[in-house]
Curated annotation (Swiss-Prot):
Name of the protein described by the UniProt record: Protein LANA1
Subcellular location: Host nucleus
Keyword DNA-binding: yes
Residue ranges with Acidic residues bias: 324-419, 597-888
Sequence ranges of Basic and acidic residues compositional bias: 28-41, 48-58, 292-301, 314-323, 472-528
Function: Multifunctional protein that plays a role in the replication and long-term persistence of the viral episomal genome in dividing cells. Binds to mitotic chromosomes via its N-terminal region and to a 16-bp imperfect palindrome within the origin of replication (oriP) located in the viral terminal repeat (TR) through its C-terminal. Tethers viral episomes to chromosomes during mitosis. Plays a critical role in the shutdown of lytic gene expression during the early stage of infection by interacting with host TRIM28.
Organism: Human herpesvirus 8 type P (isolate GK18)
DNA-binding domain, as annotated region: 1008-1129
Stretches with biased composition (Low complexity): 186-197, 263-275, 431-471, 529-596
């Protein structure tokens, strides 16, 4: 059996190149990723390879003969996978199942037979997965079924679980695939998400089968399938449902492979069988394996590079093939499980060296459970080294079982989503993981149980060997491979399954019972056939159950009385079945693989079909190990009754050489066997029920196992009678086997042609790769040139940016110069304006002086006229006085009249004073100037007119009058704002200081300005914003609102009058700021206020800059410079 390191460690220890990067994301080491390659290369890992092969990528994944392109194992299974060494087997199986298993192979393709063999060949992994998977597995039935369901239960337990994978993997084997599905369903639970990822990857990689197909090359794709399977088988304890598939993936891969791949499972089993049965067969298988391994390694190396991704897809397909092979082999390997385990152990030792290295890495990542299985195998092979590793792996198994539950869920998703590869991987992984989970419950202490299992495994191989020695040609050839596989697989599976069988023989008896239950769906037909088989072969149902249990419990059965009896019964069954395979191998190689695939479906339906398919799988393995087939023929002679039944089955297989003939014959034979085995299986069902109880109670398991051993002994007696009948049938089967061998040779030739075609395709692929590399190099050169151009462009852009910066600097300098020029121009313009203003003022003063002079001249003329009039009046008065003198009385009266006249003049002068009061009202100088001549005009009334003004002039000195008359302001001149508007605002100490009507605006501006409104002691007052409009009231509220530490508004003022008298007056307010940014923000604040308050008037604004800072730093200075634009420069 495979060295303890077989799975991960042998792969690692082998140091086989871990080329597979895609093997599993979970792979703890790149080596595990290469498990597939290492597994193929390493014989140590026979068990691991069996489990790994079936589960992971191993020969089982390789077995996808149908798709040589998909898998390197697509080549004759022996060629593609070192464990495949039995090429003849692949040739018979490939006739029908190969292509479907190739694409669908792992789970659904011809994997229907695979499930039985699968648990056996994966015995380590599958037995673990079936039995360990059973307790931890989602359903004990599914877990128990996988051995049974692997033969028959696959449709039953795995049909509910796996149907999607089967549908995905192989529509032809969809019934088979549905059985994988349950493990996949369970496997998603147990599988870690990483396992699902690796499974998905392997699905992707598996499509490129050729690279993955080579188990020997173990192109990372090939090994990754094992990794997936091993990881899945280990990780998904649910795999127990699929454990058959998990086993199938290792062994089951061979059935789907069986055309080419069956050599892997069979090769793994047949080399072990050859070693146990015929060493020469093993040597031949090993030699074929070594040759194919070298070829596959080349292909794998090529395909690994080109097809690592494909390898994943191929792995998924290989896993499908493995599962299909597992189904076929599970059927046959349940019977041939011991043989296949031994053969698979030997083939797996080689393949495990290659595959186990890859699978070990993959399995380690995939499942520490598989590591436990590997360690169990290693414990058998390297019990001491592996016991420690098993301790670790036992812990890992528990962790992996948890991961497996997650992975089972993930795989359910993957199987639903990920198609065949994931399902098969999940199934195998679930089987493997169910095995580890079951191993954990049953291996609860994997180390202890492993040693126990190793002991029982060793004992079982010993028991099996004695039992095999009793039927040694039967069992040694069959069970020694099976024991080797069981011992390897049983070490792995028996360690888990010895854990399980010992712990789970009740549990596996329950699985057997559950398997009948699981078989009931899967074996419900089989059980119906079992009753039939129990009638004809109740020993075989027990044998099948034991064999199925042996896939699950072959270790336990071999380990325990049931194992001994089923081992004997299995040898009996395996002898006829192996005789049938021998006879049926030529006939059944094509039909058997087809039949195995169909029989897997039927055997999933029927236990005997499972057994027969196990026989067929064993036959495939026997076909791979033709020498073992001789041993099996000897066993067949011993099991002539079974062989006769198997001869009938072989005749049925001959009738159904196209899958259905053999299946029908096998169904008929199996129905006969079912009649015999219905009693046996009824007994076994009772035993399995006892085993289920024993799964609950290990002690009951032992008692039930003893009972089962007794029943099996009875059945063996019945089987001995049947063996005599089978011996007759075996002779017929031998003839059929010869025909099958011829067909196998033809298939081998076809496989060789396919290999040559594959090589040509690989060469073409290499050429394409080289061309692609050249194109890539050219692209890289172009990219480098583009990068250089980009760098040059960047440099040019940088230079342009520098030039732009320089231009900007020049522009800034120009702008500064322009600003300076503008300032100078402004200064010049202001100076000119001031000069013009001064000149205008001087002119106005001169005009005023001239006007005053003219007025004075006019006044002088008026005074002269008045003097003349006064002189004339005096003359008249003198004349009157003379007359008065002449007439004294008259003279007195005249004097009185003169005195009366003087007051009139005075009154007139007073009226003239009133006129002076009227002058201010009559604001025009013209009226003032025209009034004296108007007075002068009425000379007739000297008293009212001229006398008034004259006296007015006399009494008001002319120099004073011009000052009064200088007020020449027109009526329409703009008036200054009312004094209440002109009061400069005082800074507010608190908000209440702000007038109530201006307070909302003040608060709004304070929030808007924020920090900008605060006083900055470092800044000076050099900026202002001038707001102007026609509403002095709104401007007053604005000036009251803009009162902050860094923003201060002056009082309301008015702009200079534009010119025409009737133009409206424009009022303004200056808001002084400390910097330009604040002044801009003040403008924005007013615009924001106007936007939110439609009734507020729209004010125009402009920013003003001062050369010299304004003295606004002291808070005490309440200056409102806003009213004087002179402050602006």
């Amino acid at each position: 059996m495979a060295p303890p390191g077989m799975r991960l460690r042998s792969g690692r220890s082998t140091g086989a190149p871990l080329t597979r990067g895609s093997c599993r994301k979970r792979n703890r080491s790149p080596e595990r990723c290469d498990l597939g390659d290492d597994l193929h290369l390493q014989p140590r890992r026979k068990h691991v390879a069996d489990s790994v092969d079936g589960r992971e990528c191993g020969p089982h994944t390789l077995p996808i003969p149908g798709s040589p392109t998909v898998f390197t194992s697509g080549l004759p299974a022996f060629v593609s996978s070192p464990t495949l060494p039995v090429a003849p087997i692949p040739s018979p199986a490939p006739a029908t199942p190969l292509p479907p298993p190739a694409l669908l192979p792992p789970v659904t393709t011809s994997s229907s037979p695979i499930p039985p063999s699968h648990p056996v060949s994966p015995g380590t992994t599958d037995t673990h997965s079936p039995s360990p998977a059973l307790p931890p597995t989602q359903s004990p039935e599914s877990s128990q079924r996988p051995p049974l369901s692997s033969p028959t239960g696959r449709p039953d337990s795995s049909t509910p679980m796996r149907p999607p994978p089967s549908q995905q993997t192989t529509p032809p084997h969809s019934p088979t695939t549905p059985p994988p599905e349950p493990p996949s369903k369970s496997s998603p639970d147990s599988l870690a998400p990483s396992t699902l990822r690796s499974l998905r990857k392997r699905r992707l990689s598996s499509p490129q089968g050729p690279s993955t197909l080579n188990p020997i090359c173990q192109s990372p794709p090939v090994s990754p399938p094992r990794c997936d399977f091993a990881n899945r088988s280990v990780y998904p304890p649910w795999a127990t449902e699929s454990p058959i598939y998990v086993g199938s993936s290792s062994d089951g891969d061979t059935p789907p492979r069986q055309p080419p791949t069956s050599p892997i499972s069979i090769g793994s089993s047949s080399p072990s069988e050859g070693s146990w049965g015929d060493d020469t067969a093993m040597l031949v298988l090993l030699a074929e394996i070594a040759e194919e391994a070298s070829k596959n390694e080349k292909e794998c190396s090529e395909n690994n590079q080109a097809g690592e991704d494909n390898g994943d897809n191929e792995i998924s397909k290989e896993s499908q093939v493995d599962k299909d092979d597992n189904d076929n082999k599970d059927d046959e390997e349940e019977q041939e499980t011991d043989e296949e385990d031994e053969e698979d152990d030997e083939e797996d030792d080689e393949e495990d060296d290659e595959e186990d290295d890859e699978e070990d890495d993959e399995e380690d990542d995939e499942e520490d459970d598989e590591e436990e299985d590997e360690e169990e195998d290693e414990e058998e092979d390297e019990e001491e080294d592996e016991e420690e590793e098993e301790d670790e792996e036992d812990d890992d198994d528990e962790d992996n079982e948890d991961e497996e539950d997650d992975e089972e869920e993930d795989k359910k998703e993957d199987e639903e989503d990920g198609g065949d590869g994931n399902k098969t991987l999940s199934i195998q992984s679930s089987q493997q993981q169910q095995e580890p989970q079951q191993q954990e419950p049953q291996q609860q202490e994997p180390q202890q149980q492993e040693p126990q299992q190793q002991e029982p495994q060793q004992q079982e191989p010993q028991q099996q060997e004695p039992q095999q020695q009793e039927p040694q040609q039967r069992e040694p050839q069959q069970r020694e491979p099976q024991q080797r596989e069981p011992q390897q697989r049983e070490p792995q599976q028996r360690e888990p399954q010895q854990r399980e069988p010992q712990q789970r023989e009740p549990q596996q008896r329950e699985p057997q019972q559950r398997e009948p239950q699981q078989r009931e769906p899967q074996q419900r037909e089989p059980q119906q056939r079992e009753p039939q088989q129990q009638e004809p072969q109740q020993q075989e149902p027990q044998q099948q159950e034991p064999q199925q249990q042996e896939p699950q419990q072959q270790e336990p059965q071999q380990q325990e009385p049931q194992q001994q009896e089923p081992q004997q019964q299995e040898p009996q069954q395996q002898e006829p079945q192996q005789q049938e395979p021998q006879q049926q191998e030529p006939q059944q190689q094509e039909p058997q693989q087809q039949d195995e695939q169909q029989q897997d479906e039927q055997q999933q339906d029927e236990q005997q079909q499972d057994e027969q398919q196990q026989d067929e799988q064993q036959q495939d393995e026997q076909q791979q190990d033709e020498q073992q087939q001789d041993e099996q023929e000897q066993q067949d002679e011993q099991q002539q009754d079974e062989q006769q039944q198997q001869d009938e089955q072989e005749q049925q297989e001959e009738q159904e050489q196209q899958e259905e003939q053999q299946q029908d014959e096998q169904q008929q034979d199996e129905q006969q066997q079912d009649e015999q085995q219905q009693d046996e299986q009824e007994q076994q069902d009772e035993q399995q029920q006892d085993e289920q109880q024993q799964q609950d109670e290990q002690e009951q398991q032992e008692e039930q196992e003893q009972q089962e051993e007794q029943e099996q002994q009875e059945e063996q007696e019945q089987q001995e009678e049947q063996e005599q009948e089978l011996e007759e049938q075996e002779q017929e089967l031998e003839e059929q086997e010869q025909e099958l061998e011829e067909q196998e040779q033809e298939l081998e030739e076809q496989e060789q042609e396919l290999e040559e075609q594959e090589q040509e395709l690989e060469e073409q692929e290499q050429e394409l790769e080289e061309q692609e590399q050249e194109l890539e190099e050219q692209e890289q050169e172009l990219e480098e040139q583009e990068q250089e151009l980009e760098e040059q462009e960047q440099e040019l852009e940088e230079q342009e940016q520098e030039l732009e910066e320089q231009e900007q600097e020049l522009e800034e300098q120009e702008q500064e110069l322009e600003e300076q020029e503008q300032e100078q121009e402004l200064e010049e313009v202001e100076e000119q304006e001031q000069e013009q203003e001064e000149q205008e003022l001087e002119e106005v003063e001169e005009q005023e002086q001239e006007q005053e002079e003219q007025e004075e001249q006019e006044l002088e003329e008026v005074e002269e006229q008045e003097e003349q009039e006064l002189e004339e009046v005096e003359e008249q008065e003198e004349q009157e006085l003379e007359e008065v003198e002449e007439q004294e009385q008259q003279g007195v009266e005249q004097q009185e009249q003169e005195t009366v006249e003087e007051p009139i003049i005075l009154h007139g002068s007073s009226s003239e004073d009133e006129m002076e009061v009227d002058y201010p009202v009559v604001s025009t100088h013209e009226q003032i100037a025209s009034s004296p001549p108007g007075d002068n005009t009425p000379d007739d009334d000297p008293q009212p007119g001229p006398s008034r003004e004259y006296r007015y002039v006399l009494r008001t000195s002319p120099p004073h009058r011009p000052g009064v008359r200088m007020r020449r302001v027109p009526v329409t001149h703009p008036k200054k704002p009312h004094p209440r508007y002109q009061q400069p605002p005082v800074p507010y100490r608190q908000i209440d200081d702000c007038p109530a009507k201006a307070r909302p605006q003040h608060i709004f501006y304070r929030r808007f300005l924020g920090k900008d409104g605060r006083r900055d002691p470092k800044c000076q007052w050099k900026f202002a914003v001038i707001f102007w409009g026609n509403d002095p009231y709104g401007l007053k509220k604005l000036s009251q609102a803009f009162q902050f530490g860094g923003v201060k508004a002056g009082p309301v003022s008015c702009l200079p009058h534009p010119g025409p008298d009737q133009s409206p007056i424009t009022y303004c307010v200056y808001v002084y700021c400390q910097n330009k940014d604040t002044s801009k923000k003040v403008q924005m604040a007013r615009l924001a206020w106007e936007a939110s308050h439609p009734l507020a008037g729209n004010l125009q604004s402009s920013i003003v800059k001062f050369k010299k800072p304004l003295p606004l730093t002291q808070p005490g200075e309440n200056q409102g410079p806003g009213d004087s634009p002179q402050e602006m420069t």
